[in-house]
Structures are given as C-alpha cells and as structure tokens.
A protein has these predicted regions:
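Short, solvent-exposed loop/turn motifs
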Residues: 27, 60-61, 126-127
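Residue microenvironments linked to proteolytic maturation
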Residues: 10-13, 50-51, 70-173
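Short conserved beta-strand and strand-loop elements enriched in small hydrophobics
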Residues: 40-62, 108
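Short glycine-rich, polar/acidic loop-and-turn segments at beta strand-coil junctions
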Residues: 15-19, 54-58, 87
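Flexible loop/turn segments at secondary-structure boundaries
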Residues: 21-22, 59-62, 69-71, 117-119
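A short, polar/proline- and glycine-enriched secondary-structure boundary/capping micro-motif
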Residues: 23-25, 63, 93-97
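Short amphipathic alpha-helical segments that mediate assembly, nucleic-acid/protein binding
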Residues: 176-180
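Polar/acidic, low-complexity leader/linker segments enriched in S/T/G and N/D
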Residues: 1-46, 166-175, 185-186
C-alpha cells in the first residue's frame, strides 16, 4: 500500500456511526452527525487541516506536536461515516506507520464537545444522546474505539474496481463490514 501511494500510508474505514449506541453508551443522531461532518469537511478537510492525534486526549485543541494523521475525505454510506486518512511523517505518524506495517489493528474515535441527554432505550437501559450543541473537533487513533467496527485498514489510493461492491470502496473488508453492521442492527 505504501509503495502504491507515492510513499504515503493511506488507510480507510468507519470513522463514526449514526443512530447506534457506542461502547461509551452514546448515540450520535444522524442529523447532528451529518451537520458536523459537513462543517468538518468545509472547515478542516478542504483546507487540509483535518488533523488528529494518537490516543484520545481530553483537550478541545489538536496539539500539533502530537499530530499523526490528516483526514483527506469522508462520506456517508447509510448510517456509517467512512473516511480516508493519510498517515503523516511526524513522530506520532511514524509510530502509526510502524504499527500498521506490523499488522496491528487500529481504531479511530471522534473527539468533540457538547452536551448529552439521558434517554431510555426500549429495554429500559439508559443511553446518552449527543445534544444539538455537539461540535466535532477531530478523529484520533485509538486501540479500542467506542464505535463498533471503527477500524482503519491500509488500502491502495487507486481503488481496484473489482473490489467495489454496491458503490462502496471497502475492498476485501466489505464482507467483514456487512457482518459487523448486521450484528449491530441485531439481524
């Protein structure tokens, strides 16, 4: 993958999922996630400053000395927000690069600010619905993402048309993604 991308490591996968409870007990409503994805694309991706860090700092500011990657594209496929991420040649980016080269499975997690509202699910368990004031700050690489299936996979920047399934570019991971989505939906 690195050789095919002019020496750049590019990874793709699920960034976030709408209307599904994550491992932190939060649900991101579709309308809020769509709004923030659009704002993030306009304010950060198009300006080539959609930077993120390793791990998941509590800060509402991306610390440049810890930057490891840049989001280059994101789009919705159903309720999944998918994205393309370029790993940078920074000290933290080099750690990511080596982890990927060694076959380590890495996840990604959104960082944001805003309120949450406690609501009750049909089974009586509480869930935290992300409020309308939510603001997306960044996507950070983590070892254990809160969004089910939010893992990144090294892929060639040039999409192999034989790997496109129903307009999706998940390549050989389409089957895995379908299985994960069926489990999440309870099918």
């Amino acid at each position: 993958s690195i050789k095919e991308n002019d020496g750049k490591l590019v990874v793709k996968g699920v960034l976030q999922r709408a209307n599904a409870k994550n491992q932190n007990g939060r649900v991101y409503p579709m309308e809020i996630l769509q709004r923030e994805a659009k704002n993030y694309e306009e304010g950060f991706i198009k300006q080539k400053r959609a930077l993120g860090e390793l791990d998941h700092p509590d800060s509402s500011v991306v610390n440049l000395q810890n930057v490891s990657h840049n989001i280059t594209e994101m789009h919705f496929e159903g309720e999944n927000l998918l994205g393309t991420v370029e790993i940078l040649t920074t000290p933290s980016g080099n750690i990511l690069r080596e982890l990927f080269k060694n076959g380590i499975k890495l996840g990604i997690s959104s960082r944001g600010m805003g309120s949450v509202e406690a609501i009750e699910e049909a089974d009586g368990k509480p869930v935290m619905k992300v409020g309308k004031d939510f603001e997306l700050i960044a996507f950070d690489f983590v070892s254990n993402p809160s969004t089910h299936g939010a893992f990144m996979y090294p892929l060639s920047e040039n999409v192999d048309k034989t790997q496109v399934q129903e307009g999706r570019t998940c390549g050989s991971y389409c089957k895995t993604e379908n299985i994960i989505n069926k489990i999440i939906r309870g099918e």
